[in-house]
């Protein structure tokens, strides 16, 4: 989400996505863009180990509210776009979000409920996040991109809720609570 935001405030990864979209648009190849917000599954990829070992996860997100989206909803929309024969998705950019905008603190509460154990969200400074990622061996450009993305979130750019999932699939977006229950084994 944000690929069409103002160039001066848009994080590098999103700007690069938009550049790729422009190339596709100019090619005149039929397209449908799926502009998905922050994936719920990022919690599994980036936080499950620390939740298992420390009962906490560490993110430089402050109190930013984010409409996290489950990748299963993105996949369902992709199926509709790819199998539609009426052309209603052609040339469109679908903004895909979850059905609720949550802070990481609220996400920790939901994880706690679903896992049956206390999970804490620790808001870390950008500097501490950079150090932690560097210590993990991450490349500098990835570190910078992640910090930029969370700055974008803290500025309120990922809190909007889009009706696209329900409009296209006929189903409400998967809730964070359902995600946490479905993926509980990854955090235990």
Regions found by a protein language model. Name each.
Residues 127-188:
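A hydrophobic C-terminal alpha-helical subdomain
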Residues 3-120, 124-127, 131-136, 141-142, ...:
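Oxidoreductase cofactor-interface core, primarily capturing Rossmann-like NAD(P)-dependent enzymes
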């Amino acid at each position: 989400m944000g690929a069409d935001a103002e160039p001066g405030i848009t994080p590098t990864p999103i700007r690069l996505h938009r550049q790729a979209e422009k190339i596709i648009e100019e090619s005149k190849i039929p397209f449908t863009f799926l502009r998905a917000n922050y994936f719920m599954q990022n919690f599994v990829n980036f936080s499950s180990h620390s939740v298992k070992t420390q009962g906490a996860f560490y993110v430089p997100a402050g109190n930013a509210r984010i409409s996290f989206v489950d990748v299963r909803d993105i996949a369902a929309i992709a199926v509709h776009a790819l199998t539609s024969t009426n052309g209603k998705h052609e040339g469109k950019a679908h903004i895909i979000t979850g059905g609720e905008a949550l802070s990481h603190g609220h996400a920790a509460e939901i994880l706690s409920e679903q896992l049956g154990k206390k999970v804490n969200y620790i808001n870390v400074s950008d500097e501490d996040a950079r150090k932690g990622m560097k210590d993990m061996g991450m490349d500098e450009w990835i570190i910078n991109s992640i910090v930029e993305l969370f700055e974008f979130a803290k500025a309120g750019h990922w809190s909007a809720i889009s009706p696209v999932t329900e409009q296209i699939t006929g189903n409400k977006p998967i809730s964070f609570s359902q995600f946490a229950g479905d993926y509980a084994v990854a955090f235990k």
